[in-house]
Amino acid sequence: LDNIFMVTLMPTEGCNFRCPYCYEDHHAVSMTRDTLDRIEEYITAQAPRYKQVILAWFGGEPTLCKDTVLEVSNIVQNLQKQYGFHYAANMTTNGYLLNDKLFRQFYQAGITSYQITIDGWNHDKTRPHVSGKGTLQTIINNLASLSKLPPAEYSFHITLRHNILADDEDYSWYDYL
């Protein structure tokens, strides 16, 4: 662990979901330019001392701040070229905005591992969009689209996390997946 530099970044407290069990207040607060500059200074000072640098994107919902994610990732990729450390990145996301186009941009930025939570058949009740509409089908469509990417070109990992809630009694969900 002495050779690994891991930074967890929360580009926004905002989220496009309104999960009733969430602990976040959903303030639409995002990183300021000053914060981004300080992150760049910090990573630039620290990264060359390590053999591996890992960025972990968290939120709120990090896909809402695509430009921030891409900017910081680009900084680390440039440092990687200069200093030769191994770079890896992961993201915890609700998966709603993770379509083909955004995934490809993030992939080029070195983000190759994702964690997406799905609440089974109750998902649309427990993980509704800020508009109140369901989100499950969009996420499933995104995942299906990503699963068709050519493995020779795209080596990535998605962990699907499933919250099992008190009233979950229909386990056919696992067959559906």
Where are the predicted features?
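Short acidic donor-binding/metal-coordinating loop in glycosyltransferase active sites
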Residues: 11, 59-60
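Canonical Radical SAM [4Fe-4S] cluster-binding loop centered on the CxxxCxxC motif
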Residues: 2-34
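Acidic metal-phosphate-binding loop of nucleotide-sugar-dependent transferases
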Residues: 29, 61-62, 95-96
